[in-house]
């Protein structure tokens, strides 16, 4: 009957979601009796609420796809509905030759980002609301009179400031109680500095500027660090000086330091321990870098302020960098993705490892399909090895994270989402990677 196909797809998809299973539906077709009804040969393959393949009705098509059993197992482990039952079945040994077949299903290279514009905009608005509501509650609970946030002109601090502004609007508080601090250092470029200043002024926050150069040079002198040696001490000394400044301003103004670091940075440990790693409430802690871009873009598209939109678009166009090393010819010399790898790859690895529990070999296979034509296989494997090495080695930073709102199904909070020992060994994962 007319309209039955839509209902059938919803029914099959819904049932596969309810049971966390694969569902294969095969309808009768050409050749069946048409005395009272006509069969449409509507064939459907669904997995956990998602229609993988469906046949065109009345075409007698054969459809095929792959059902990811490991994914279904991972989903069922997360649900208390499905108990572990070790009895009640019989094992029957048999021989089966296992061959690797070509995967035909779509592998999303951006698992954190909805594909359709409508879904993406709805998700962005929801995430901004979750972040803002989380901060609103924390400000109310602590009776803080201000929020203190370091603004670098980069993506993460920009998003954190936008969230803070939304939280203040919910509270009916003056934006001047947002102490937005720019702290120029040895690696600050004119582009990021100008964007930071413009952003703060567009949002009517209280602009503050505290240069860290003199304080860091004095600190280097005190500890015997040669400022011409651009090592980890040179970089981390700047990050910790900035955090000290923000903490002290917060104490002085009865405020709270708002953390800016995102989920991708936390996964890689790309943060200075007790530097930008530390805050009083970390609003971006469960937002991956690939999603941060879309959140800032969504704000730019919907803010209704041309000047603010222009600033946000230039922030989006700026290379991701901690700006801890001196610039070259006035431009950013230290680009994060050149050092640790593309964030779109790392977010893909992170999602499939934490959300679905996949092993390195499977993640590598899926990544080769998802990023075919974008990255060479050798590049994908190189950064996958980097991801595992850093993820395990940097757990000690995640073991003492500040509070922050969870916005999605993947998070690394040590208080519930990732109860992982800081001295966990990566050996088993590296051995599998070395065999690829």
Segment roles from a protein language model:
Residues 6-13:
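Charged helix-capping and loop-helix junction motifs
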Residues 3, 17-21, 30-34, 41, ...:
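ATP/NTP-dependent adenylation/nucleotidyl-transfer catalytic domains that generate, transfer
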């Amino acid at each position: 009957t007319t309209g039955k196909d839509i209902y059938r797809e919803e029914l099959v998809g819904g049932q596969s979601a309810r049971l966390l299973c694969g569902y294969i539906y095969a309808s009768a077709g050409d050749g069946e009796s048409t005395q009272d009804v006509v069969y449409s040969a509507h064939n459907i393959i669904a997995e956990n609420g998602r229609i993988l393949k469906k046949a065109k009705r009345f075409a007698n098509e054969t459809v095929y796809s792959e059902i990811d059993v490991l994914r279904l197992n991972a989903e069922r482990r997360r649900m208390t509905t499905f108990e572990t039952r070790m009895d009640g079945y019989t094992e029957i040994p048999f021989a089966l030759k296992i061959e690797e077949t070509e995967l035909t299903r779509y592998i999303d290279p951006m698992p954190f980002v909805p594909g359709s514009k409508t879904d993406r905009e709805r998700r962005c608005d929801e995430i901004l609301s979750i972040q803002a509501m989380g901060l609103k509650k924390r400000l109310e609970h602590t009776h803080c009179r201000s929020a203190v946030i370091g603004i670098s002109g980069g993506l993460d601090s920009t998003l954190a400031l936008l969230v803070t502004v939304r939280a203040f609007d919910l509270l009916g508080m003056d934006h001047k109680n947002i102490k937005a601090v720019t702290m120029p250092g040895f690696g600050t470029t004119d582009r990021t500095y100008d964007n930071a200043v413009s952003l703060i002024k567009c949002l009517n926050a209280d602009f503050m500027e505290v240069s860290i150069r003199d304080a860091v040079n004095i600190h280097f002198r005190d500890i015997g660090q040669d400022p011409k040696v651009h090592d980890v001490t040179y970089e981390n000394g700047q990050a910790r000086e900035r955090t000290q400044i923000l903490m002290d301003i917060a104490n002085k103004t009865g405020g709270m330091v708002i953390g800016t670091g995102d989920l991708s940075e936390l996964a890689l440990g790309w943060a200075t321990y007790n530097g930008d790693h530390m805050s009083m409430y970390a609003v971006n802690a469960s937002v991956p870098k690939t999603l941060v871009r879309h959140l800032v873009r969504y704000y730019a598209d919907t803010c209704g302020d041309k000047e603010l939109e222009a600033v946000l678009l230039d922030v989006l166009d700026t290379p991701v960098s901690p700006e801890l090393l001196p610039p070259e010819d006035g431009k950013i010399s230290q680009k994060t993705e050149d050092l640790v790898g593309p964030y779109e790859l790392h977010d893909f690895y992170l999602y499939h490892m934490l959300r679905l529990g996949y092993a390195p070999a499977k993640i590598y296979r899926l990544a080769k399909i998802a990023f075919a034509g974008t990255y060479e296989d050798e590049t994908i494997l190189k950064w996958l090895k980097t991801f595992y090495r850093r993820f395990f080695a940097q757990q000690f930073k995640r073991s003492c994270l500040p509070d922050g709102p969870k916005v999605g199904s993947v998070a690394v909070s040590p208080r519930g989402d990732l109860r992982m020992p800081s001295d966990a060994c990566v050996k088993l994962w590296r051995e599998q990677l070395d065999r690829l």
